[in-house]
Amino acid sequence: KLNYLAIYGVSGGGYFTAQAVEKDPRIHAWIASTPIYDVAELFRKEFGSSLKAPSWLINAILKLAGNLNESANLNLKKYAWQFGTSDFKSAIDDVFNHAKIVDYQKIQCPCLFIMGKGEGAELQHQTKVIYEELKSKNQQTKLQVFEAESGADAHCQVNNLRLAHNVVFDWLDTLFEWNQSKF
C-alpha cells in the first residue's frame, strides 16, 4: 500500500497530472507548475491566430526554429510524442479535437500550485481559478507565486529551479510530516 504518493507536473505536465489526480484516489498530493484544467483554451489564448496558418507553414517555421534552437526542437518533439502525433501542429489539432476539460471539482488531495509572474496570462488565470476552488476543500492546498525578484518568475521556474524545488520539498515535508532524522 502506498502511504505517501505525490505527483509533480511541470509545464504541459500540469495538465496530464491534473487528469491523474482527478481520477486516482491513490495520489495523496499534487504539485503543478502550473496547473492546467483546459489545455485547449490555453492553446487558443496563448497561440491565438497563429493557429489559423496552414499546417505545412506552421511545421516549416517550427522546423526552422528547431534547427536554430536544440532545446526548442526537443520540446516540440516531446509534445508531439506526448500527444501521439508526428509533429507539433498535429498535436495542437489533436488537443482541439480530443482534449477533455479536467473536472477539478473531483480533486480531493492537497495541492501545491507554483506560478511565476512571467507566466502567460491564461496559465496564470487557470492557476488562480483552480487554486481558489480547491483551497476551501483542503487547508494544505497552497499557491506559491514567484515575483521577478525571486529569480524564479519564468515559466516553470527554469531560471531558479533550486528555489522552486526547495518550496516543493518543504511543502511535502510538512504535508507528510516526515521525520528528518530518518534520512
Residue spans of the language-model regions?
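Active-site nucleophile elbow and catalytic-triad environment of alpha/beta-hydrolase enzymes
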Residues: 85-103
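Acidic catalytic loop of the alpha/beta-hydrolase fold
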Residues: 117-122
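Catalytic active-site module of serine/aspartate enzymes centered on a nucleophile-bearing elbow/loop
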Residues: 154-183
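Hydrolase active-site cap/lid region
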Residues: 22-91, 114
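Short beta-strand/loop motif that positions the catalytic acidic residue
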Residues: 107-108, 113-115
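Short alpha-helix in the alpha/beta-hydrolase fold that links the catalytic acid
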Residues: 109, 123-133
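Catalytic histidine neighborhood in serine/cysteine hydrolases
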Residues: 131-153
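Alpha/beta-hydrolase fold nucleophile elbow
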Residues: 2-11
